[in-house]
Amino acid sequence: MASSASMLINYPTTFCGVRNSSNPNNDQFSDQINIPSSLNNNINISKITSKTNKIIPKAVASPVIPSSINSNNITTTTPNIKRIIHEFDPKVPAEDGFTPPSTWYTDPSLYSHELDRIFSKGWQVAGYSDQIKEPNQYFTGSLGNVEYLVCRDGQGKVHAFHNVCTHRASILACGTGKKSCFVCPYHGWVFGLDGSLMKATKTENQVFDPKELGLVTLKVAIWGPFVLISLDRSGSEGTEDVGKEWIGSCAEEVKKHAFDPSLQFINRSEFPMESNWKVFCDNYLDSAYHVPYAHKYYAAELDFDTYKTDLLEKVVIQRVASSSNKPNGFDRLGSEAFYAFIYPNFAVERYGPWMTTMHIGPLGPRKCKLVVDYYLENAMMNDKPYIEKSIMINDNVQKEDVVLCESVQRGLETPAYRSGRYVMPIEKGIHHFHCWLHQTLN
């Protein structure tokens, strides 16, 4: 393993979980960048020639925009979907009510409806501003069945596109890097960082309007360390009030913890799991109800008598003081841990010198992937043993949660389970999440 002094720390991959790579065909058009290894290879982290023609003059990005993630569907709302949604009643007090039915976590048609109603509306975290802090940098990712590409052009403007070539639908770029343009690996079509079609190979004898073949754009905004995208074409770009548009009235509370210039990205860990994305969210929001039973080491770090959960519009904030008796004398959490879950699938955590973000990406009715990004205060960046142990502890917690979530998913698939009950008030965060889901899906 390389020493910390010689190791280059960078974003090793993106939410899509694709390894950093580029097609060799791109070499003739693009600036190259060396993608470094991750912080610790011992930690179980999932990393993720055409003849060209003349430049097509005055090409601009295409104005053709799909209306939603499920752009092939006029609507995903069917009588069956309505029935499934209304099997949960948010008006019934949680103490007396039942949890959503198992079909919320297993039905393929409801999953398609979620992509349309939840993930194609409003802002979603796509990546981090450090990934595109320099001109010509880019990163890629996925959200449901949408592949996206975010870049900063040579003039410093940030763009976001569907990461799909407009010729024959090939995925255009992979991973992260730095390029002066994007070259399709299939037929060598070349697109500028503004999405315009610059070159189309072997088209000398054809006439077509390049304006209709630029990359399909997405709304994009930067809020502090976060790069946000939206598939919803209604409204403004939201670059000034995007925090309030995304989170609501508690944007300042999240900003207070996440906007810290002393923090530096240090590592990414990925955890694919065979469960519905909402199973993980439910698990995250149970106010540590499961922690004493499933996470022995983590439980020893916490003072459960101080645990507090606040419901704030689209955010559920959990706070807990750390235990005075640190396991083996190792202090990872500092005096208090702060966990902010942002509807529908993102969390910001602050504890000790750390910030971690959690992104749970839906991949299907019974499949999702958790991406955990670690940020550390600059003063601790040279303490390699502390860094490795802290990441190992937190990664082990996520691995334990993967086992739990996959077990729950198997149980949801059985005929024995229909709905459950809430244990209040400890599961009020879960109920709040379910009420938001019902409102959005309805």
From Swiss-Prot:
This chain belongs to the protein called Choline monooxygenase, chloroplastic
Q: Which GO terms describe its cellular component?
A: chloroplast stroma
Pfam short name (any one): Ring_hydroxyl_A
**CDD domains of this UniProt entry?**
RHO_alpha_C_CMO-like
> Which source organism?
Amaranthus tricolor
UniProt keyword annotations, A-Z: 2Fe-2S, Chloroplast, Iron, Iron-sulfur, Magnesium, Metal-binding, Monooxygenase, Oxidoreductase, Plastid, Stress response, Transit peptide
Q: What does this protein do?
A: Catalyzes the first step of the osmoprotectant glycine betaine synthesis.
SUPFAM superfamilies to which the protein is assigned, alphabetical: Bet v1-like (SSF55961), ISP domain (SSF50022)
Please write the reaction equations for the catalytic activity of this protein: choline + 2 reduced [2Fe-2S]-[ferredoxin] + O2 + 2 H(+) = betaine aldehyde hydrate + 2 oxidized [2Fe-2S]-[ferredoxin] + H2O
Per UniProt, the enzyme's principal EC class comes to: oxidoreductase
Give all residue intervals belonging to the Rieske domain.
123-229
Report the EC number(s), separated by commas if there are several.
1.14.15.7
Cite a single GO BP annotation. glycine betaine biosynthetic process from choline
Explain what induces or represses this protein's expression: By salt, drought and heat stress.
PANTHER family for the chain = CHOLINE MONOOXYGENASE, CHLOROPLASTIC
What's the record's note on cofactor binding?
Binds 1 [2Fe-2S] cluster. Binds 1 Fe cation.
Write out the residues that bind [2Fe-2S] cluster: C165, H167, C184, H187
Q: Which GO terms describe its molecular function?
A: 2 iron, 2 sulfur cluster binding; choline monooxygenase activity; iron ion binding
Which biological pathway? Amine and polyamine biosynthesis; betaine biosynthesis via choline pathway; betaine aldehyde from choline (monooxygenase route): step 1/1
